[in-house]
Amino acid sequence: MNDKIRVGLIGYGYASKTFHAPLIMGTPGLELAAVSSSDETKVKADWPAVSVVSEPRHLFNDPHIDLIVIPTPNDTHFPLAKAALEAGKHVVVDKPFTVTLSQARELDALARSTGRVLSVFHNRRWDSDFLTLKALLADGVLGEVSLFESHFDRFRPQVRDRWREQGGPGSGIWYDLAPHLLDQAIQLFGLPVSMTVDLAQLRPGAQSTDYFHAILSYPQRRVILHGTMLAAAESARYIVHGSRGSYVKYGFDPQEERLKNGERLPQEDWGYDMRDGVLTLVEGETRKEENWLTLPGNYPAYYAAIRDALNGNGENPVPASQAIQIMELIELGMESAKHRATLCLA
């Protein structure tokens, strides 16, 4: 593909409006050609030149559309991605990849058989704080990490009337937030030996998981992943302890908030996180504590990599094989919680 890659976006809810549409439009070599939506006015208010169609099938049947992006309710990921692949399109699916592991494996096999690129939007690989932490560990600054703790805590005590908080397949924060944390952990440390997971519905009227606490066990390391909707006080985003020192970071990557506020790309100061982490290093009897500059986040890198992959100039940034690993952990975690047991990976 030497001309612009024409993208069809399914739906125009929060994920499409906040993440996918502006990131696609801000990526040289990509063109948001059409959106399937029942609310043409909403789409046109943001992107007047973009065509709006009533049904996803119109995108699948359009020979000029190269790539289909699917940021729809989780239980629709599988049928929509399957239909798009069968229509010969390349596909990006928002996380979580699917609702079940078997669905994820079926899509991967279909993409391989059709020779299409299938990628999953695990955008938090490009969070400011995660990129900073990844660099710290790669450089060995903390030594051998023995304890890694990652929180995604919010204060939303009232259950809202939206699909993510209803009781359907793929709802709740084990499917919404945990995939981010699981993906980051695997990026840093690989797959664990075993998992111990607690899932709960703690808010009055909750119909889906609004609390999770997962312990991923490695031979010389424990990884704790935690999420709740009932944390009024600020929690540390990361707490990492190693043989040479520790790193603690508060606050969330700023990119989502800026995109939500309608900022457009590119911008020179994109991704800058004004909150430093705290690095504590110990050598002998000397203990040194310093603020550690947070690297800029880079969500635009995902779609730039998708462009390059479709043009044959680079690798798929998040191939289905990696997203399948997340689905394995999602399902194993649910079994662990159900049986109140520590379960080993197969």
Task: Show the residue positions of the predicted features.
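N-terminal Rossmann-like dinucleotide-binding module
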Residues: 1-47
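C-terminal helix-rich "cap/oligomerization" subdomain common to oxidoreductases
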Residues: 1-4, 67-69, 264-265, 291, ...
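Hydrophobic residues in well-ordered beta-strands that form the structural core
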Residues: 54, 93, 118-120, 149, ...
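Rossmann-fold dehydrogenase core element
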Residues: 106-123, 144-148
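Predominantly a Rossmann-like dinucleotide-binding segment in NAD(P)-dependent oxidoreductases
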Residues: 124-205, 340
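Contiguous beta-strand/loop segments that form the cofactor/metal-binding neighborhood of enzyme cores
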Residues: 183-265, 300-314
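Beta-loop-alpha module in the N-terminal Rossmann-like domain of NAD(P)-dependent dehydrogenases
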Residues: 50-109
